[in-house]
Amino acid sequence: MSIDLNWETLTTGPDGIALAERIRDFVHAKFQTVTLPRFIKGVKVHTFEFGSIAPEVELKDICDPLPDFYEDIDDDYVEDDEDEENSENSQTDEENEVAKTLRERRRLDRVERTANGSSHVSTPPAYIDTRYPGLRSMQASGDTGSPFLGVSTPGIPGGTSNLSYFHSQLASGLSGTQTPLAAVAGAHLPQGWPDRPSPSLHLSALRNQSHTPLSHTASERSMTPPQIADLNQQSLREKASVSTLAASSSTTRPATRDGVPEATIPEEHAGESEESTSPPRRFREPKVEDLQTVFRVRYSGNIRLSLTVDILLDYPMPSFVGIPVKLNITGLSFDGVAVLAYIRKRAHFCFLSPEDAYAAIGADEKDADASAGMKMGALLHEIKVESEIGQRENGKQVLKNVGKVEKFVLEQVRRIFEDEFVYPSFWTFLV
């Protein structure tokens, strides 16, 4: 179902101007934390404009929110609704600071897991099953023996496919609701969740099976069945930790709804002692009125971002002088899947990675027929940039490092977008 946006109302007027200024400040602050190459002195972001072209938004699904959206970021855990509302009014600024800290912690954990690869098995996500106590008894015994377990998927630490990601919770004995994308990608049960049947979710899971790559590595072919089972279990644990990114700081995981405490997980690295000082993750109790919508967003417009970069010249000595280079991002092309959840006067927003996007809504018919052009889930496809450097000689740029500067800036724009807006990173707004 397509949704029409009044783009002019959203992006103009006092509110639109203030929002554009906040985005400019945010991008500028992110560039100040980036490690610059030797030939660049500094980056300054001057203006941001939304442009006149509105994105195309299509509603794909309405379902239960992702488990990470229930994480409690208040200093004092509040279960009563009235106390929670009072806490929101008095601690808005403090919550924003804590939210920034949590996003930074998720980003650092993701970087650490990427560096360590499959050699490090992270702590599984400390999700608490609160809504579907009867789900374990309804699991099919044949699911855990699926031939798709352990399939290699490029770009995901741990080498596990999307389908094994969903089967991981079954294999480890956890509830289906503990799977971060079970809410959007479909349930494992033939009839969906017990209290919220959704045939579209089951169809999405079936579509996901048809797009799961079946390329095992040579080492997996040579392994005996017990070895393959061990490898699958290790990969499943790694995938579960990748979906959370905010590692639990305590050495024990919270007790499940059945009252059975989880096993103690020792620390493997001395560098993790700093994380042990941070408070453990806490989750709010889900309610029936909680809602999440899944959208497909397409955009090919004239959004503008103006910034300057100082290029250092090494003649007659290193870093002798800096010359400002003005870069204008004049447009970009985008195609991805967005998630918007509403939980207790809070709106949570994020985009899904390409793998999770296909798992959530399946492949579009237009994507299957298109041999070229944009492909769903690839997020930023194209960024148009123009550069200006003072005087020109015979229509050519005087400096030779302009191409390197443009490449560096575009890489940082992509990195900022993916680190801040792609799940498991998400933004929370008080509404």
Curated annotation (Swiss-Prot):
Subcellular location: Mitochondrion outer membrane; Endoplasmic reticulum membrane
GO MF terms, alphabetically ordered: lipid binding
Membrane topology designation: Peripheral membrane protein
A single GO cellular-component term on record: ERMES complex
Biased composition (Low complexity): 241-254
CDD domains per record: SMP_Mdm12
Residues covered by the SMP-LTD domain: 1-431
Protein's UniProt keywords contain Transport: yes
Compositional bias (Basic and acidic residues): 97-113, 255-272
Pfam families: MMM1
PROSITE patterns (UniProt xref): SMP (PS51847)
Alphabetical keyword list: Endoplasmic reticulum, Lipid transport, Lipid-binding, Membrane, Mitochondrion, Mitochondrion outer membrane, Transport
GO BP term (any one): protein insertion into mitochondrial outer membrane
Domains as described in the record: The SMP-LTD domain is a barrel-like domain that can bind various types of glycerophospholipids in its interior and mediate their transfer between two adjacent bilayers.
PANTHER family: MITOCHONDRIAL DISTRIBUTION AND MORPHOLOGY PROTEIN 12
Subunit structure: Component of the ER-mitochondria encounter structure (ERMES) or MDM complex, composed of MMM1, MDM10, MDM12 and MDM34. A MMM1 homodimer associates with one molecule of MDM12 on each side in a pairwise head-to-tail manner, and the SMP-LTD domains of MMM1 and MDM12 generate a continuous hydrophobic tunnel for phospholipid trafficking.
Function text: Component of the ERMES/MDM complex, which serves as a molecular tether to connect the endoplasmic reticulum (ER) and mitochondria. Components of this complex are involved in the control of mitochondrial shape and protein biogenesis, and function in nonvesicular lipid trafficking between the ER and mitochondria. MDM12 is required for the interaction of the ER-resident membrane protein MMM1 and the outer mitochondrial membrane-resident beta-barrel protein MDM10.
Family in the record: Belongs to the MDM12 family.
Name the UniProt record assigns to this protein: Mitochondrial distribution and morphology protein 12
Organism the protein comes from: Botryotinia fuckeliana (strain B05.10)
The encoding gene: MDM12
